[in-house]
C-alpha cells in the first residue's frame, strides 16, 4: 500500500503542477489515458475533445459508474507547495486533481480484482465541471445509458483528513444565474423630471429581491438569493438610460427552483413598472440540486464504517455541483472527502492532504464492488 500511495502522490503532484481549465484538459486527458492503458484498462471511444470514459469488468450484469472531474480554475496560486502550479493564472483550487488521481487509483484496484467483479464499472473522467458542461456532455454521448447507479466525491477543507461526510437527500444546491436590465430614459442630471431614472428603480429592486427569500419562500426551505453586481451610468452629471443588476439564487429542490425564478421575474418587472421603467429579466439554469439516494447514502456510510473510516453527517451546501445531472433519473451518492482543515474551495491558498489518496481510492473501489454484488443479488 505504501508503494501504491507513493505512485498516487506522484500523479497528483503532476496534475497539480499542470492545471487546465474547463474544456482545455488536453494534457490531463492524455495522462489519464496513459495510466489506464498501462493498467490494461479498456478505454471507450468518447466523442468529446477532452475527458475519458473507461470500464473494468465482465461487460455483463449490472453497471455502475464512478466519476471524477478534471478541470482547474482561473486562479493564481498563492501556496508555497513544492509542486505549485506552473501555469500562470491557473490552479487546482477545488481539488479536482485529487479526484482524478483517486479515481485512477480505484481503476487500478478494480483491474486487479476484475475477475471478482459481479458486473461492470464505468469510469468517468469528466471535463468542464466548473462551467456546468461536463456531466451533460458525458450523458449526451449515450455511452452511459446502461448505468444503473452513480458515485462521486469531492474534497472538503472543513473536514479532517481521512474522514468522510455523507448525507441523504439534498446535499448541494442549484446555482442559477439571473440578470435584469432596467430601461428608463436618460438625460441631464439637473433635469430628472425630464427623465425616467432607472437608478432608484435599481436600488428598490435590490431591496425588494432580498425579501423574496424572507417573505415569499418557506422558512423550512433552503434558499439563498444574492445580488452580486449593480451598475448604471458612466459619469457624474448624466442620468443613465439603463441600469443592470445580476446575481444568483440557490435552491435545494426543483419546486423551490421554479418558484424562485417566478418570483425574481415578478419582482423585477413590478418594481420597474412602479418607477415608470421596464425590466428585461434573464435567468439561466445551471446544474440541478444534488439529491443523494437515502438507501445508498446509508450503504456508503455502512461500508465506510466497516472499513474503519470515520464518517460524519455532512452539512448541506448551497454550492452547485453538476454531478447532480447524473442523479436526475438514477440513484447514486455523492460523498465529501476530508482532506484537512484549511482555506476554502476556490481560494488561492487552497490545499489538500494527499496522504488520504490511497484510502480514498480503496473506498471508491470497494463501493463499486459491493454495489455490483448488491445489484446482482437483488
Regions found by a protein language model. Give the residues of each.
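Acidic/His- and Gly-rich active-site-bordering loop/insert found
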Residues: 1-92, 97, 101, 108-117
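Histidine/acidic-residue-rich, glycine-tolerant segments that coordinate divalent metal ions
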Residues: 52-53, 73-75, 80-91, 98, ...
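Metal-dependent amide/peptide-bond hydrolase catalytic core
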Residues: 203-378
Amino acid at each position: 500500500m505504501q508503494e501504491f500511495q507513493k505512485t498516487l502522490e506522484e500523479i497528483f503532484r503532476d496534475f497539480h503542477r499542470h492545471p487546465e481549465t474547463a474544456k482545455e484538459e488536453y494534457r490531463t486527458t492524455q495522462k489519464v489515458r496513459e495510466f489506464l492503458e498501462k493498467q490494461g484498462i479498456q478505454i471507450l471511444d468518447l466523442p468529446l475533445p477532452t475527458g475519458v470514459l473507461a470500464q473494468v469488468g465482465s461487460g455483463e450484469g449490472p453497471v455502475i459508474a464512478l466519476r471524477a472531474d478534471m478541470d482547474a480554475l482561473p486562479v493564481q496560486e498563492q501556496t508555497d507547495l513544492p509542486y505549485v502550479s506552473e501555469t500562470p493564472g491557473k490552479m487546482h483550487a477545488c481539488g479536482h486533481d485529487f479526484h482524478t488521481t483517486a479515481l485512477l487509483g480505484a481503476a487500478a484496484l478494480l483491474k486487479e480484482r476484475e475477475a471478482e467483479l459481479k458486473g461492470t464499472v464505468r469510469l468517468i473522467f469528466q471535463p468542464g465541471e466548473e462551467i456546468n458542461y461536463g456531466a451533460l456532455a458525458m450523458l449526451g454521448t449515450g455511452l452511459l445509458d446502461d448505468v444503473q447507479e452513480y458515485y462521486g466525491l469531492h474534497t472538503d477543507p472543513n473536514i479532517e483528513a481521512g474522514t468522510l461526510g455523507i448525507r441523504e437527500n439534498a446535499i448541494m444546491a442549484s446555482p442559477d444565474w439571473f440578470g435584469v436590465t432596467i430601461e428608463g430614459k436618460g438625460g441631464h442630471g439637473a433635469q430628472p423630471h425630464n427623465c425616467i431614472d432607472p437608478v432608484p428603480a435599481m436600488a428598490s429592486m435590490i431591496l425588494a429581491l432580498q425579501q423574496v427569500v424572507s417573505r415569499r419562500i418557506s422558512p423550512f426551505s433552503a434558499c439563498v438569493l444574492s445580488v452580486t453586481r449593480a451598475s448604471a451610468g458612466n459619469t457624474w452629471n448624466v442620468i443613465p438610460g439603463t441600469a443592470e443588476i445580476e446575481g444568483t439564487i440557490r435552491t435545494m429542490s426543483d419546486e423551490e427552483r421554479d418558484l424562485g425564478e417566478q418570483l425574481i421575474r415578478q419582482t423585477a418587472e413590478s418594481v420597474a413598472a412602479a418607477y415608470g421603467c421596464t425590466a428585461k429579466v434573464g435567468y439561466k439554469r445551471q446544474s440541478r440540486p444534488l439529491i443523494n439516494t437515502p438507501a445508498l447514502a446509508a450503504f456508503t456510510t455502512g461500508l465506510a464504517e466497516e472499513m474503519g473510516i470515520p464518517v460524519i453527517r455532512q452539512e448541506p451546501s448551497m454550492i452547485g455541483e453538476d454531478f447532480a445531472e447524473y442523479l436526475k433519473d438514477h440513484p447514486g451518492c455523492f460523498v465529501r472527502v476530508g482532506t484537512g482543515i484549511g482555506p476554502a474551495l476556490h481560494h488561492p491558498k487552497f490545499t489538500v492532504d494527499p496522504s488520504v489518496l490511497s484510502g480514498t481510492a480503496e473506498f471508491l473501489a470497494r463501493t463499486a464492488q459491493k454495489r455490483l454484488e448488491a445489484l446482482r443479488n437483488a
